[in-house]
């Protein structure tokens, strides 16, 4: 199980570095990459989900390793008991599905809270971007996903431009999305090229390294974090569920002039309805103090197999 996941991680890392290399964004040029992991909640055209959310989290490329480790540490005790790899997807964790059915409601709530708490505990700060659409307010169902992608991409592009304007910090961006449908992947990449080279409603994308990358959510915990963010934003708008929203709201990216990383298309009556939301029946659980870890035993040096023939000339 771990070997298969390691293989997926290696492939994802290769894709990301290949994109950065193709765009010539090496450190020697003074550039580095911000990765925004995105996922969605709700289904365009589904009357049972009146809202659609595309949301995710932006992290500096050198943060992703540590974020993966922190999220792995949340899942590990549950995986040991389940005997298999568990994804940190918010909906199955809440509904007790996809391997989470053997755990109590309190345990699942603690795991869900710990996932969102990654936003609070990470330094430098993580930035959240989201587009929320009330489906009744869009003229065509087919426009919902492209509209959400356009506004999130535009906001992320503005975020990178603002970093340069304020801090003289040249950064480039890359989207990593959950690989769900091949047709959606092709459509998104084509749409991104149009926004970059032709333009969108507010201009052109200027700070992206490449077209978006798509990865199986099993290969990276960061897409699972994006899933949790999208899910709890969706719950806030559709169910007036205030359990996860207060943890996410402070982390919407600041874009200057009062603008944030949150974009909303709502029925005029919806803000008043949201204002009536009540505190959750089951409060957000506090963090569990980490037990002191014993010193790790010294591991013997690994003897790597010799791959060259005896007497081969090796020129490093």
Model-derived features with residue positions:
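Phosphate-ester processing/binding pockets and catalytic centers
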Residues: 2-316
């Amino acid at each position: 199980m771990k070997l298969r996941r390691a293989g997926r991680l290696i492939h994802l890392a290769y894709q990301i570095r290949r994109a950065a290399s193709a765009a010539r964004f090496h450190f020697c040029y003074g550039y580095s990459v911000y990765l925004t992991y995105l996922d969605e909640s709700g289904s365009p055209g589904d009357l049972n989900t009146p809202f659609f959310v595309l949301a995710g989290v932006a992290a500096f490329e050198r943060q992703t390793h540590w974020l993966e480790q922190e999220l792995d540490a949340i899942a590990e005790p549950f995986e040991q008991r389940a005997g298999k790899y568990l994804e940190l997807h918010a909906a199955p964790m809440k509904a007790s599905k996809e391997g989470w059915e053997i755990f109590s409601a309190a345990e699942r709530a603690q795991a869900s809270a710990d996932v969102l708490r990654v936003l609070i505990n990470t330094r430098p700060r993580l930035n959240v971007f989201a587009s929320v659409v009330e489906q009744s307010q869009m003229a065509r169902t087919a426009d919902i996903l492209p509209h959400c992608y356009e506004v999130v991409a535009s906001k992320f592009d503005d975020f990178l431009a603002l970093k340069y304007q304020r801090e003289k910090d040249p950064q480039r961006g890359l989207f990593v999305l959950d690989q769900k449908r091949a047709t959606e992947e092709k459509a998104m990449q084509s749409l991104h090229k149009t926004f970059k080279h032709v333009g969108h409603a507010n201009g052109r994308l200027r700070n992206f390294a490449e077209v978006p990358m798509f990865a199986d959510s099993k290969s990276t915990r960061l897409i699972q974090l994006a899933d949790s963010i999208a899910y709890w934003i969706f719950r806030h708008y559709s169910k007036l569920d205030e359990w996860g929203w207060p943890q996410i709201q402070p982390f919407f990216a600041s874009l200057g002039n009062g603008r944030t990383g949150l974009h909303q298309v709502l029925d005029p009556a919806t803000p008043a309805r949201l204002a009536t939301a009540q505190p959750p029946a089951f409060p957000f659980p506090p963090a569990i103090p980490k037990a002191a870890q014993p010193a790790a035993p010294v591991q013997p040096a690994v003897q790597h197999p010799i791959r060259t023939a005896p007497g081969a000339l090796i020129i490093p």
